[in-house]
Amino acid sequence: MKFEVIQKSGGSRARLGRLLTPHGVVETPCFMPVGTSATVKAIFPKDLEEEGIKLILANAYHLLFRPGISVIKEFGGLHQFMGWNGAILTDSGGFQVFSLSPFCKIFPEGVRFKSPVDGSFLMLTPESAIHAQMELGSDIVMSLDHCPPWPSKEKDLLEATRRTIQWAKRGKETWMQQQEKLFSKPSASYSLFGIIQGGTDERLRLYCSEELMKIGFDGYAIGGLSVGEPHEESLAVVKTVSSFLDEKAPKYVMGMGQPWQIVQMVDLGIDLFDCVLPTRLARHGSAYVEEGIIHIKNARFRKDGSPLDSRCSCYACRKFSRGYIHHLLKSKEILGIMLLSMHNLLFYNRLMKEIRSFLAHGQWVDFLARWKDKKVTK
């Protein structure tokens, strides 16, 4: 993988970049739609490709259980299995193990947990996490980390941070040993990211950042945010870590993805984002519009003949009214969720295009002013 910073914004850490992957060029700042189980929910892959989306996220934890890494490998890897021609970033599954799995127990070797599918006990290690993602053929592989809950005691935060560093070292060693064996393309084309932990303790975050940079990764992710902490504390962590990290490497904030949060974090120098909100909110009947979020299930939209957003050119906005989509959702028709999901993802994609355009034209400050205080729900 190669990352290029094309242009920086004066008076800000915001930057325009380009990520070169084995499956195409990804322009940054970039938002990754979440395809947890090898699909972005309620969306055809071709629709994402037609809208210029180049990078999506999948999760090794979920794929480990269903259909299984070995099954996907038999199909030729994750790209072939899911019919996706763009790039894929896979999460190691650490967050899901700690947050979703019952009977989770941590050891120096890794984390032991109970399968949500058949109840068997499994062990996820830094080595097995790397192996699984490499066998999937991921363009960007994430190291295994220990994501502590919020709030956590100082002692627990320190232990999780040290464990994350040790696991990152072991993951990097495995990566170096295995990549040429598993990848048919030149190994340098693929990349390994380290994940920075430390809760909202900025000193621990800097300590973790420094140690991961000593190990050396192709990119750096800030994990363990959006787990209940106040947004102001999240933002402070991102600001501190982003200003400390190597400027030549891509920076990724994991799981934080409200539009106004993305704008704030782009201003702090972040390049990559992911979040389940666009499709999750769609499944609950909500749509992103220029003014904020509207809840189409509300009775006031029953006879509304206007499109979801008059400034949007997506298929849902071109062809259908708010009233019709309201009807679909109330009738529990799948089409309603599909239309809202695509609309919301294209809202995000359009936002990222606007961000890149304003950065390219040296007008980032103007764009930032437009988004001030945008946290509206209707």
UniProtKB/Swiss-Prot annotation:
Q: Name one GO cellular component term.
A: cytosol
Q: What class of enzyme is it?
A: transferase
- The question of whether Glycosyltransferase is a record keyword is answered with yes
What remark does the entry make about the cofactor? Binds 1 zinc ion per subunit.
For this chain, one GO molecular function annotation is:
tRNA-guanosine(34) queuine transglycosylase activity
Catalytic activity annotation: 7-aminomethyl-7-carbaguanine + guanosine(34) in tRNA = 7-aminomethyl-7-carbaguanosine(34) in tRNA + guanine
What's the EC number here? 2.4.2.29
Task: Alphabetically list the UniProt keywords.
Answer: Glycosyltransferase, Metal-binding, Queuosine biosynthesis, Transferase, tRNA processing, Zinc
Answer whether the UniProt record assigns the keyword Zinc to this protein: yes
Which residues does the Swiss-Prot or TrEMBL record annotate as the active site?
A: 91 (proton acceptor), 274 (nucleophile)
Region RNA binding, annotated ranges: 279-283
Top-level taxon of the source organism: Bacteria
Cofactor(s) required for function per UniProt = Zn(2+)
**Entry's InterPro entries?**
ArchSynthase1/Queuine_TRR, TGT, TGT-like_sf, tRNA_ribo_trans-like
Residues annotated for Zn(2+) binding in this entry = 312, 314, 317, 343
Which positions in this protein are listed as binding substrate?
A: 91-95, 145, 197, 224
Secretion signal span: none
Report the record's Gene Ontology biological process terms.
queuosine biosynthetic process; tRNA wobble guanine modification; tRNA-guanine transglycosylation
Q: What pathway annotation does it carry?
A: tRNA modification; tRNA-queuosine biosynthesis
Q: Which family does it belong to?
A: Belongs to the queuine tRNA-ribosyltransferase family.
Subunit and interaction comment: Homodimer. Within each dimer, one monomer is responsible for RNA recognition and catalysis, while the other monomer binds to the replacement base PreQ1.
* Functional summary from the UniProt entry: Catalyzes the base-exchange of a guanine (G) residue with the queuine precursor 7-aminomethyl-7-deazaguanine (PreQ1) at position 34 (anticodon wobble position) in tRNAs with GU(N) anticodons (tRNA-Asp, -Asn, -His and -Tyr). Catalysis occurs through a double-displacement mechanism. The nucleophile active site attacks the C1' of nucleotide 34 to detach the guanine base from the RNA, forming a covalent enzyme-RNA intermediate. The proton acceptor active site deprotonates the incoming PreQ1, allowing a nucleophilic attack on the C1' of the ribose to form the product.
PANTHER family according to UniProt? QUEUINE TRNA-RIBOSYLTRANSFERASE
Name of the featured protein: Queuine tRNA-ribosyltransferase
